[in-house]
Amino acid sequence: MLSRKAVAALLLVHVTAMLASQTEGFVPIFTYSELRRTQEREQNKRLRKSLRVQQRSKAAGRLEPQEVMEEEENGVIKLTAPVEIGVGLSSRQLEKHRAVLEALLSEALPPPSLVFGGQRPVTAAWE
């Protein structure tokens, strides 16, 4: 038969396994030093932001913090890479929507006489 030590060891392993299956363990993702570093970075960001607000208020008269926040939220997004915007149409789609496209372009663009001094430019491939 099994010795007392073997039975006690098996019983201990079984009890430990049962307790482990019943409990929900928490393993921290970040260490204390990483959390502290993250908090310091956030605090530095806030300090830099408040410093920028103070500099702006000195340069452009007194601005309220709400006005500065609204100004930053409504800011223009500046692109750092070239962006190509275009529309591709097949010949069937072009024939179907030609009148609408010509109307939109005539509203959006000035007449050719104003742009090219009376000369008629080649404006599209379908002409």
UniProtKB/Swiss-Prot annotation:
Expression (tissue specificity): Present in the gut mucosa with the exception of the gastric corpus. Also present in medulla oblongata, nucleus of the solitary tract, hypophysis, spinal cord, hypothalamus, and cerebellum but not in the cerebral cortex.
Any single Gene Ontology cellular-component annotation: extracellular region
Family matches, as InterPro entries: Motilin_assoc, Motilin_ghrelin, Promotilin
Location of the region described as Disordered in the Swiss-Prot/TrEMBL record: 41-67
Name used for this protein in its record: Promotilin
Keywords: Cleavage on pair of basic residues, Hormone, Secreted, Signal
Role, per record: Plays an important role in the regulation of interdigestive gastrointestinal motility and indirectly causes rhythmic contraction of duodenal and colonic smooth muscle.
Location within or outside the cell: Secreted
Secretion signal, residue range per the UniProt entry: 1-25
Species annotation: Cavia porcellus
